Structures are given as C-alpha cells and as structure tokens.
Amino acid sequence: LLGYMDTTEHTFREFDTETNFYSGGIGSDLNIYSLYNSEDVELKFDVKTKTLAGRIKDTVRLMAEMMFKTVFTDEKHLREVVAETRSRLKVRLMSAGHQAAVSYSMAGITVDGWYNDYSMGIGYYDYLVKLDENFDGEKEKLIKGCEELVKAMFKKENMLISCTRDDEDYAKFEEAMSSFIGKLDDFEKKNKADVSTLEKYRPDVKYRKTAFSTPAEIQYAAVSGSYKDVPDVNDGAMTVTRHLLS
C-alpha cells in the first residue's frame, strides 16, 4: 500500500506526480532469505529508488514521506487499491502460469516457499479475493495492521542503507540521508510500537494436491520436493542448475 495511499502532505495522485518528476519511481518489496542449515527464513522489507544526483535530496524526502507519513484510513481508496491489486495479480498469474504453479507447489514444502507464494503468488491472490469480497468486515483489521507494522519495521536498529553513486556525488547522498535519519528519529519517538505484543509468525506448511481451472489454453503441472536431507547437494550446484533451467 505504500506509495498508493495519501500521505499527510500529498494526495496519492500528487505523490505519484512528485515521485515521477524527481525520480525513476519509489518502490517497495518483501525479500525472503533462507538461513543456511536451517528451515527458518528472514524477511526483509526493501524500499528502493533511482534518481539523478541533483535530485537525490527531493527523492529521499519523498521516500521518507512514503515510509513515515502514509495514511491508511481512507477506506474508499483503500478498497480501490485492494480491488486493483487483485485484478493486476490475476492477469500476472494467468500470463505466467508455470511460475504460479511452481510457487504454489513449493508453498507446501518449505517455509520460504510458503512466504513467497503468500506474498506474490496464488496464496496472496486468495487473500486478496477474501479481502475484496469481505472488505467491510476486514477493513479495520487491515488498517490497524498496516499502522502497527510500519511502526515495528521502520526502526534505526533494523535499517541498512546502501547507495550506488560516483564518489563526487556521495556528499549529496550523505546530506540527504542526514535529513532522512532525523525524520526516522522523529517517527520512532512519536510512534512507539508495543513490540512485546508481536509474535513471530510460523506458517503452517502442509503438502497439498490442488488443481485450478482457468480459461488458458496451456495446462501446467508442478511437482515439488526438498533435497535438504540428501547428502552432497549443498555445494551450490543445484543453485546453478536452477538458473540454467529457469
């Protein structure tokens, strides 16, 4: 929802115009990292952008506005965003059925596969369908969850900042980030999340056999498995093979 809702300073249309004027866009994404020799994963929320050196100050200002000042309480527009996201995801899944099938299949095998499917695959689409069709009953939970989540995520101790830039332009980046860190400090002081009430979520990974019917002319069948207990396969060869076959 970040970047698609109003902020305390701009409407979502004004914010979109500003970001396109000063940058090549500001995006956010969830990255899933498997831990070595463990079935657990780490989730990292990325906010990224690209811009010219002369516009980095305004771009970082808008990035901070999106992260710290997004307003989730516009129920009418929130419902529009949910419906639009549902529609876009359906088209994407239909156009990449092979990827959707593999993602759904892996969700029943591994924790990282589950998170991947429920953040961008059929699992996520099922959630959006239920949310869209029962929005009035779910909207308060959604709004409160988003507000509490940004408070818990955007903390200085959780944050890693990186930049790719020429040496002569690095001073501009440091200046912009100094202002960003100040806004982050203000956000933390104003919005202290009660992290003691937050529990680590552990997905219920269960193998399942499922079929989906679509109007597509091509049928995809996906079968998944895990080789974590197979000796001599964790030397990187399987990772290389996966990229060769994809």
Model region roles, listed by residue range:
Residues 1, 45-47, 221-225:
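Short, hydrophobic beta-strand segments
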Residues 167, 184-238, 242, 246:
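Acyl-CoA-dependent O-acyltransferases
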Residues 14-200, 246:
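Charge-rich, well-structured scaffold segments of protease-associated domains
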